[in-house]
Amino acid sequence: MAKGQSLQDPFLNALRRERVPVSIYLVNGIKLQGQVESFDQFVILLKNTVSQMVYKHAISTVVPSRPFNVSNHQATNAQAGYNAQHDETDEK
């Protein structure tokens, strides 16, 4: 497994498993919303009213709508950072 995917795969899998609604921002600024239905090395299948295949190279940011559990230790640390960031935002 490539080093870059050691965080990506558990993160996306937890989003899929827990059916967490996400906002996906593309590099061109477009915002897509839905749930991660499936993913592989190159694409994410995003389901809303329709299913869309989104190429990962076109994605800038994936933003979960709520906290969720990630089983991978590295991913858990990233989730803690996500929670801390949103706690700061909520206080403003």
UniProtKB/Swiss-Prot annotation:
Example of a GO cellular component annotation carried by this entry: cytosol
In its keyword annotation, does this UniProt entry include Oxidoreductase? Answer: no
The alphabetized list of GO BP terms reads: regulation of DNA-templated transcription; regulation of RNA stability; regulation of translation, ncRNA-mediated
The protein's GO terms of the molecular function aspect are: RNA binding
Q: Which part of the chain is the Sm domain? A: 9-68
Write the signal peptide boundaries. Answer: none
Family as reported in the entry's similarity comment: Belongs to the Hfq family.
Query: What's the subunit arrangement here?
Result: Homohexamer.
Q: What does this protein do?
A: RNA chaperone that binds small regulatory RNA (sRNAs) and mRNAs to facilitate mRNA translational regulation in response to envelope stress, environmental stress and changes in metabolite concentrations. Also binds with high specificity to tRNAs.
Name under which the protein is recorded: RNA-binding protein Hfq
Species source reads Shewanella piezotolerans (strain WP3 / JCM 13877)
Question: Gene of origin?
Answer: hfq
